[in-house]
Swiss-Prot record:
The keyword Signal applies. It comes from Penaeus monodon (Giant tiger prawn). Its main location: secreted. The modification Valine amide is found at V118. Hormone found in the sinus gland of isopods and decapods which controls the blood sugar level. Has a secretagogue action over the amylase released from the midgut gland. May act as a stress hormone and may be involved in the control of molting and reproduction. GO terms for cellular component: extracellular region. This is Crustacean hyperglycemic hormones 4. The keyword Disulfide bond applies. Disulfide bonds join C53-C89, C69-C85, C72-C98. One of its GO terms (biological process) is glucose metabolic process. Belongs to the arthropod CHH/MIH/GIH/VIH hormone family. It is found in: Secreted. The gene is CHH4. Keywords: Amidation, Carbohydrate metabolism, Cleavage on pair of basic residues, Disulfide bond, Glucose metabolism, Hormone, Neuropeptide, Secreted, Signal. The lineage of its organism: Eukaryota, Metazoa, Ecdysozoa, Arthropoda, Crustacea. Gene3D superfamilies: Crustacean CHH/MIH/GIH neurohormone.
Length: 120
């Protein structure tokens, strides 16, 4: 009986939460998730895109390359790694060193293909 009362209380609490208006539902449908955190400042979809990259804009590939640089920075904690890895559209020695250090050799070709696609 105690378990049933607890279950009923939890169910009632969930119903109240589901029925109450939330700040997220008050946002317009065309608002981006980033605008919720930045106030009136809206981010462009390509705001993190390096204009030096003259290849194909592929958000997924750029994210993969960017995560490699983030991981490398997290390992070494050197500011020059964070900025240098992304410089020249990832076509630099720091990026190659990070690739060699963090990615197993049999998976490095995948990152090099991504570099060729988005790069110079």
């Amino acid at each position: 009986m105690v378990a049933l009362n607890t279950l009923s209380a939890v169910s009632a609490a969930l119903l109240v939460l589901a029925a109450s208006p939330s700040p997220a539902s008050a946002r317009s449908l065309d608002a981006s998730p980033s605008s919720a955190f930045s106030g009136n400042h809206s981010l462009s979809k390509r705001s993190l895109f390096d204009p030096a990259c003259t290849g194909i804009y592929d958000r997924q590939l750029l994210g993969k390359l960017g995560r490699l640089c983030d991981d490398c920075y997290n390992v070494f904690r050197e500011p020059k790694v964070a900025t240098g890895c992304r410089s020249n559209c990832y076509y630099n020695l720091i990026f190659l060193d990070c690739l060699e250090y963090l990615i197993p050799s049999h998976l490095q070709e995948e990152h090099m293909e991504a570099l060729q696609t988005v790069g110079k």
